């Protein structure tokens, strides 16, 4: 979980979960859907689904719309998984450097 510190910084204490892991573990496995099967049902290349579930590719807007339609979820659900994953990875990798390099400014209310 990421928690905002009082000074505005972030404490990052959980591992990033790739959207492909969610797709694989929470949707494909319980429903018995293969990579090839999902690719056929979504009308996308097998390589796209394979790369996503093997956590080598992210979810695009096009893929999010297709997954949302197929699994009766929302495109926002899939895009938010991707956004959260990327932000958490970047916080873990670069936040301390960014905090040192970038001066904070506030807008007067």
Regions found by a protein language model. Give the residues of each.
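N-terminal flexible/basic segments that precede or flank functional cores
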Residues: 1-25, 30-31, 97-101, 109
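Hydrophobic side chains within well-formed alpha-helices
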Residues: 19, 74-75
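Short alpha-helical DNA-recognition segment
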Residues: 32-51
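Residue-level detection of the helix-turn-helix DNA-binding "recognition helix"
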Residues: 54-56, 83
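Short, basic-rich loop-to-helix N-cap that marks the start of a DNA-contacting helix
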Residues: 56-69
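Short, charged recognition helix plus adjacent turn
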Residues: 69, 79-109
């Amino acid at each position: 979980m990421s928690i905002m510190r009082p000074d505005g910084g972030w404490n990052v204490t959980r591992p990033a979960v790739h959207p492909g892991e969610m797709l694989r573990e929470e949707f494909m496995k319980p429903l018995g859907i293969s990579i090839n099967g999902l690719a056929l049902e979504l009308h996308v290349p097998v390589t796209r689904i394979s790369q996503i579930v093997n956590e080598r590719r992210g979810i695009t807007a096009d893929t999010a719309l297709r997954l949302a339609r197929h699994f009766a979820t929302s495109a926002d659900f899939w895009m938010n998984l991707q956004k959260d994953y990327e932000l958490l990875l970047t916080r873990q990798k670069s936040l301390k450097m960014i905090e040192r390099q970038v001066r904070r400014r506030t807008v007067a209310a």
